[in-house]
Regions:
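Generic recognition of stable, solvent-exposed alpha-helical segments in well-folded globular domains
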Residues: 3, 85, 118-126, 143-154, ...
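An acidic- and aromatic-residue-enriched active-site/binding cleft used to recognize and process polar
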Residues: 13, 18-25, 31-32, 93, ...
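Acidic, Ser/Thr-rich peripheral helices and adjacent loops at domain boundaries
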Residues: 29-55
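Active-site proximal beta-strand in glycosyltransferases
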Residues: 90, 160-183
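Active-site and adjacent substrate-binding regions of carbohydrate-active enzymes
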Residues: 128-136, 150-160
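Conserved small/polar residues in nucleotide/adenosyl-binding loops
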Residues: 190-191
Length: 191
């Protein structure tokens, strides 16, 4: 998605992006003495990254809560600049969260199906709620790959809560949503 951000910045488009704050970043692939692939993650120190707390209207770092079965997960938000545009990064490594919930945003492509699904809920539903908390009201929403698809359901939920039928909400949300994929092969599909 970085290329979308860079291009939008270069073109001067009014654009904001939301992603996950992966504390261990991308992995390094190592081939060991048995010609087997090993994956090594290298934790980031937040102080070393070009990010700052995303500050809300109350002057404090934006933090939201997401309901999961039997628990609530706190998500705090960081801000990075990509050219002239804001990139908001969602982070579950928050004191008070369970250890497994703190790890939701540790690794890109890490974990099992449950971890991936949980990351997608944080990104999709959490992303909408974060933009609302920041006072950002996009006229068009773009989903790059299926990882943020839960934003469609969250936006429909908002409209139904305001009295629209689900069918009307879905129609309006669909009309203001774009989807792109950079890996159009079955192996890349999220199920």
């Amino acid at each position: 998605a970085g290329d979308h951000c860079k291009a939008a910045s270069d073109l001067g488009l009014p654009f904001v992006a939301v992603g996950l704050m992966y504390h261990q970043g991308y992995f390094t692939q190592i081939i060991d003495e048995h010609a087997e692939q090993r994956v090594e993650f290298h934790p980031h120190r937040l102080d070393d990254l070009p990010i700052t707390p995303a500050i809300g209207g109350d002057g404090r770092q934006v933090e939201i809560e997401l309901a999961f079965p039997g628990r609530s997960v706190r998500v705090r938000v960081w801000q990075a600049m990509v050219g002239h545009l804001n990139l908001y990064l969602l982070d579950t490594d928050v004191p008070g969260n369970r250890d497994d919930d703190r790890a939701i945003t540790y690794q890109l492509y890490g974990g099992d199906r449950t971890t991936r699904l949980t990351q997608e809920i944080v990104l999709g539903i959490g992303g909408v709620r974060v933009l609302r908390a920041l006072g950002v009201a996009p006229s068009v929403w773009h989903i790059n790959e299926g990882h943020a698809a839960f934003l469609v359901l969250e936006r429909c939920r908002e409209q139904v809560a305001h009295g629209r039928s689900f069918a009307a909400a879905l129609e309006q949300v669909a009309a203001a949503t774009l989807f792109t994929t950079h890996t159009p092969v079955p192996v890349s599909y999220t199920h």
